[in-house]
Swiss-Prot record:
Transmembrane segments: none annotated. It comes from Stenotrophomonas maltophilia (strain K279a). HAMAP family: AIRS. Disulfide bonds: none annotated. Belongs to the AIR synthase family. Keywords: ATP-binding, Cytoplasm, Ligase, Nucleotide-binding, Purine biosynthesis. One of its GO terms (biological process) is adenine biosynthetic process. It catalyses: 2-formamido-N(1)-(5-O-phospho-beta-D-ribosyl)acetamidine + ATP = 5-amino-1-(5-phospho-beta-D-ribosyl)imidazole + ADP + phosphate + H(+). This is Phosphoribosylformylglycinamidine cyclo-ligase.
Length: 352
């Protein structure tokens, strides 16, 4: 059937369908200076290529590549609710690079994925700016990424994030937990807050408490500031520690989903367990508030939140003092929180 002029459909564009290519290009131009600040000498070329290039040839003799990917969970929902978008990108970087750091690897480069229903340039620039700042702090290059505008896929004003990192470590210096032994000591390094885990429970408690945005915790910090504090980046101080005390550090753990109960044990060989003394550090005010308002059992706290311990070193017993002094010299608050013990059966972690 031939359409008559009166019935001919009006011409459509991609913008009519909800995708604004010009807005995407404008975002790229806006973030270029932020991204380039994160570049390392090994980065080849600039932004915009089909693939990002990184020259690994000069620094490593026997490099082992360590890759990681992660998101920030439902902390994003809280960011949307509070309209705070400038630090959530730091969370994204930290969740990825702190993970690969556990194996002694130096993060080399990072890529991000930002997806939204309708691109808001200001919001996206704030998020990517946070990612670039996180990469700069971690010493890795924000080498590429993807911004996807997908109409009808997300609620108005919302977006999703994912991050990807590649790190490298000399084969002879890889930390895999194989040397962890009974008697080794756990040094817990302070977190900056809940980091990016447990936020489905955080949001449920926050909602049930009436969303007290102006509430001040002990010490004068606002609750919302404590909840939105970006995940601490441990990369540079830990890499420095590995250079000076690598032989003494038998294993490491990033305390993420699963909390203290499930993360440290991941790098402990079979036949060994953990005895963690909860009294060795004070539960930070934000966790005290969450536990009280949510009537959360101790066991649930330990397996959901980091409870103030964001990263753990497993250290030879005769080297604890030296490593502890080195951690202090890096400006990191820390505590001796327990030790590795012999353990058989399913219950390998005791927190008391």
């Amino acid at each position: 059937m031939t359409n008559t002029p009166s019935s001919a459909p009006s011409p459509l564009t991609y913008r009519d369908a909800g995708v604004d290519i010009d807005a995407g290009n404008a975002l790229v131009e806006r973030i270029k200076p932020l991204v380039k600040r994160s570049f390392r000498p090994e980065v080849m070329g600039g932004l915009g290529g089909f693939g990002a290039l990184f020259d690994l040839s000069n620094k490593y003799r026997e490099p082992v590549l360590v890759s990681g990917t992660d998101g920030v969970g439902t902390k994003l929902k809280l960011a949307h609710q509070l309209n705070r978008h400038d630090t959530i990108g730091i969370d994204l970087v930290a969740m990825c690079v702190n993970d690969v750091l556990v194996q002694g690897a130096e993060p080399l480069f990072f890529l991000d994925y930002f997806a939204t229903g309708k691109l808001d340039i200001d919001t996206a620039a704030a998020v990517v700016g946070g990612i670039a700042n996180g990469c700069t702090e971690a010493g890795c290059a924000l080498i590429g990424g993807e911004t996807a505008e997908m109409p009808d896929m997300y609620a108005p004003g919302e977006y999703d994030l994912a991050g990807f990192t590649v790190a490298a470590v000399e084969k002879s210096e890889l930390k895999d937990g194989a040397s962890v032994a009974a008697g080794d000591v756990l040094i817990g390094i302070a977190s900056s807050g809940p980091h990016s885990n447990g936020y489905s429970l955080v949001r449920r408690i926050y909602d049930r408490a009436g969303r007290p945005a102006d509430l001040e915790l002990e010490g004068g910090v606002k609750l919302v500031d404590a909840l939105m504090a970006p995940t601490r980046l441990y990369v540079k101080p830990i890499l420095s520690l590995l250079k000076s005390h690598g032989e003494a550090i038998h294993g490491m753990a990033h305390i993420t989903g699963g909390g203290l109960t499930e993360n440290i044990i991941r790098v402990v060989p079979d036949g060994l367990g953990l005895d963690i003394q909860a009294s060795s550090w004070t539960l930070p005010p934000v966790f005290q508030w969450l536990q009280k308002e949510g009537a959360v059992a101790d066991s649930e706290m330990w397996r959901t939140f980091n409870c103030g311990i964001g990263f753990v070193l497993i250290v030879a017993a005769d080297q604890v003092a030296a490593v502890s002094d080195a951690v202090k010299a890096q400006g990191l608050e820390h505590w001796t929180i327990g030790q590795v013990v012999t353990a058989e059966g399913a219950e390998r972690v005791h927190i008391g």
